[in-house]
Amino acid sequence: MHLPLTSHVSVLMSIQFSSDKEAADALARSYHALRQEIGKIIIGQDEVVRLVLTAVFSQGHCLLVGVPGLAKTLLIQTIADSLDLSFNRVQFTPDLMPSDIVGSETLTQQRDFQFVPGPIFANIVLADEINRTPPKTQAALLESMQEYAVTVAGKRYPLERPFFVLATQNPIEQEGTYPLPEAQLDRFMFNIELGYPSYEAELQIVKNTTSDTKPTVSKILHAAEIQAFQHLVRRVPVADNVVEYAVSLVHKTRPGTDRATARATQLLEWGAGPRASQHLIVGAKCNALLNGKYSPDIEDVKAVALPILRHRLVRNFKAEAEGITVEQIVKELL
């Protein structure tokens, strides 16, 4: 049973929609149109596209883990184009400084300082190979993700909204890298694993990318509409049993606590924190709306649970020695 949405109308919603129900229907239609447009260029990555769009409408950020050459840059560029948002890509290297990301003050001819914005000043930022840069530079990016603003020379500069960061990591080459600590990983809503395309998908990719024609995507939404839909997601009502399921799921991952499962205590060194519970509910709200429902159920929580918990659970030596993955542990908990 799905609860009806309230008739509350926000300032942004009142531009186009008479009620939240009408706005919810428009979001579902826009989502399917986005999937169609993105599918013209991005082939065989349907689950990745679903999760990235869910994060955008949930005001979350994504960590994308995959080997080079799987079209991570093309994916986020295509999504930015279809959403009519500005896009910047930052290649993280060991010598990258915080000022290279957030910007710096320069001396003008009038002998005063002028702030020159860095690449972080875009709606969508691709932080490529974030684990290749020192912690000081990582922290500058992660602060902007949390605060939606940067501070340079004591002055605070707000970032343009909507603001979304997609950071990538290469799981193979770990030499000379600076792994993100758990506290920093917790800033990301989703950890998405990007796998190789299927044989059929790769056939289509090769045909599409080796010809002289290049498909283009239509702009489906603009910034004001995206912000309106982000506020709509937050207003979706949730039944108590769904909230209880999400919080209970997170508590099951905390080894040695009253509500932890025996399996979690046996295999995990560390469990998920309260931010995971928050992301589960917001992600479930968004997943419900994108699929034409007006309130989430437990299945919507399950639909976003793995990418939310994947980077928040730390396996112990026993789990690593036995080759038990975080994915296996999460699926057992579900």
Predicted regions and their residues:
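C-terminal engagement/docking regions of AAA+ P-loop ATPases
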Residues: 13-18, 258-334
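Conserved C-terminal "switch" segment of AAA+ ATPases
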Residues: 20, 24, 41, 177, ...
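Pre-Walker A (pre-P-loop) alpha-helix and adjacent loop at the N terminus of AAA/AAA+ ATPase modules
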Residues: 25-62, 67
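Short beta-strand-centered segment that lines the nucleotide-binding/catalytic pocket of NTP-utilizing
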Residues: 86-98, 154-158
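AAA+/SF3 P-loop NTPase mechanochemical coupling elements
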Residues: 114-123, 152-169, 180-189
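Conserved AAA+/SF3 P-loop NTPase catalytic/coupling segment centered on the Walker-B
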Residues: 122-146, 160, 175-184, 196-202
